[in-house]
Amino acid sequence: SSGTSEQFGKFLQGANAGPDASLWPKTASGTFSSMTPVPLSNYFNFQGASGSALLAAGVKSKIGAIGYAESAWFTSNKLGTALVQNWAKEFVAPTAAATSAFLGGGTIEANGSVTTPYQKAIPGGYPIGTASYGLVYPEAAKKDAEKQKIVAAWHTYLLDKCATKFPELGYIQITGALYDKAKAQIAKIK
């Protein structure tokens, strides 16, 4: 099962909601072929791949191949990327700034997750962006306090330092309300 496939499926379904819902009626799934409206092999020479590394290698090795993965895999394999039309009617590349614009237009939920607005016109927003999340034990789980300090420090590093160390891989430093919410969530790790 793939989180990337599930997120891509959510985009395909969300972007086609409303009057065009029949274009992508199935619910998102971790397996791309199980969420497509029709069996892909009936229309295309379809070859799935498990994991972004295998997918990127497969796309690179086949003339005319297309695929979807995190932008870092396409960058590191020197593969081209497609511009995707957003609801502001712009064709946008998958850049860190465009992903940040899209996620910044989302709703920050109480648990820190972001609900993405596929049908919201966000100028400059790349509409297939997604956030990464860290799952940790809540204070109520009464885990070892010293280990929890390490977990909190790791998440602080990811939030404050990691993105600025690896911008060439497409990581972005979050800011504003989303950053504030992430810091508040990290403060709960005890």
Residue ranges and their predicted role:
Residues S1-K190:
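Flexible loop/hinge segments at secondary-structure junctions
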